[in-house]
Amino acid sequence: METVKLTLGPILFHWEAEAKRDFYARIADESPVDTVYLGEVVCSKRTPFFDHHLPDVIERLARAGKTVVLSTLSEVVLPRERAMIRDLCEMPDCLVEINNAAGLLAAAGRPHRIGPMMNVYNEETMRQLAKRGADHFSLPPEMSGKTVAVMASSRVALDVGIEVQIFGRVPLAISARCFHARAHQRSKDECQFVCGEDPDGLALTTLGDEDMLTINGVQTLSYRYLNMAPEIAEMAALGVSHLRIMPHQTDMIAVTRAFADHLSGKSTAEDVTERLAGLKIGPFINGFWHAIAGHRYHQAP
C-alpha cells in the first residue's frame, strides 16, 4: 500500500489565525502526509483572518516537500465570492481544488482538482470533468465502497487521481443560512464569528439528548468520527490513490503517523483504531462505505 498517498484536507472550522499558522508549521515539520489542502471552504467571511499568513504557510509546506493545493469555497452566493473563486482558479503555477461549479469556467483547460463538495457520483460525470482539465477527484464521503470501485476502475484510463476521506467528522451538507449564528440568536450578517467558539463544531442533540450532528457555521457534519482504517487495504486494491485525513482539535501528528504506519505495513488496522482511541477520539463510523446508515460502525466478523 506504499503507493497510496496520505493527504490532509482543509481546516473546516474557524480556528484563530495564529493557531492555524502554528498547526501548519507542525504539519510541515512532523507529519508524513504527502499533500496539504489549504483555504477557506465553508464561509467567505472567515477568509481575511488567515490571508496574510497564507504565502508563508505555502512556502514552508513546499519547502518541507509537501504538495500544496488551494481549496475553493463550497458555498458561493455573492458576486465577491464568485470573484474570489475566479481569481484563485486563474492564479498561475497554483494547484486548485474546486468545491463549487462557479470555478469550472475559470479552470477549464487547466489542470485542477475536484473536491468532495462537487458531488461527483458517477464515472460519466468524472469523464466529462476530466475532459475539461480535472486530473484528481476527491469523492463525496457518503459513497459506498461498491460505487467507489466503479469510479476507481476508470482512474487509469482517465489518468486521474481518486481520493477518499478516511478520518474525521464527515461533511454532510451546506446551507446559505448560518446555524451557528441562529443558535446564538444572531443574524448571519452580525454573527460576530461565534463559530470560533467551537473549534471542532457545535454538537446537536436529539430530543432524547443523544448526540446526532455537528454544526460549523453554514455547514452540517457528522457528530461521530470517520475511521476507515479497516477499509484501507480494500481501497488500495480498488485503485484509490489518495486517502484524506481531516484536521481536528487533537494531536494530528499522531493521527497522520498512525495511518502512515499502517500504509507502510508497520501496523495493523486494529493498531490504528487503538491509537486513535488513545487520543480520546470517537465514537467511530464507517457505515457509508458498507451501504448502511452512515452513523454506524461496521466491524468485520
Regions found by a protein language model. Name each.
Residues 1-120, 124, 138, 145-301:
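Active-site pocket-lining/capping segments in soluble small-molecule metabolic enzymes
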Residues 132-135, 141:
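A cross-taxonomic marker for long C-terminal extensions/tails that follow the last structured domain
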